[in-house]
Amino acid sequence: MSQQYFAGQPAAAHRPGSVHVILPGLHLELRTDSGVFSPGRLDPGTRLLLDKAPPPPEHGNLLDLGCGYGPLALVLAARSPGACVWAVDVNRRALDLAAANAATAGLANVRCVTPGDKSLPGGFDLIWSNPPIRIGKSALHQLLGGWLPLLAPEAAGYLVVQRNLGSDSLQRWLADSGWTADRVAAQAGYRVLRARRTPADSPAGGGDRAGAAR
């Protein structure tokens, strides 16, 4: 198997490119490169999440889990300038691109870090993620099981997953794990899932959040 985008230090030769993210009132041109997720175009799942997720909170700590070169994180930062946006990934090339893209866009409220970074806060007011499905089901469950419990009591996590890559089974796993999990959007084979605490839940301690994040 060729090296995947969730490698910590991609060995692929550099092939710089760019992707445009165009939304109402917002136009971002983002630098991309080989060795990161979807370098040639804005991933359709990412686009669906951007189009269908509700507006983010104006303040607080917002998380893009598996940020890649930064499209979700930068939109969060632009839409919520009073918030701190945490862009998390294991891929150093992706993090460098996300940081450079944030600087180019003048978005000083983005922090690009690896999953084990000690500056990460203890909780989040929103999670957006196009998660790294290809790490495998067990690793994905471990990843989400470490980060979703860090949501504030009234907060939600929005995950976009292709149907043929397991969106329905992921929704069932979320429900079986004690989350209120519902589908908020579906288009062209992609599903946007919302994960919230059940009403009886109280905040639980997070698991090992140093696992793989794209």
Mark where each language-model region is.
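Glycine-rich phosphate-binding "P-loop"
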Residues: 126-139
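General small-molecule cofactor/ligand-binding pocket signal
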Residues: 31, 111-113, 182-184
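Conserved beta-strand signature within the Rossmann-like core of class I S-adenosyl-L-methionine
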Residues: 154-161
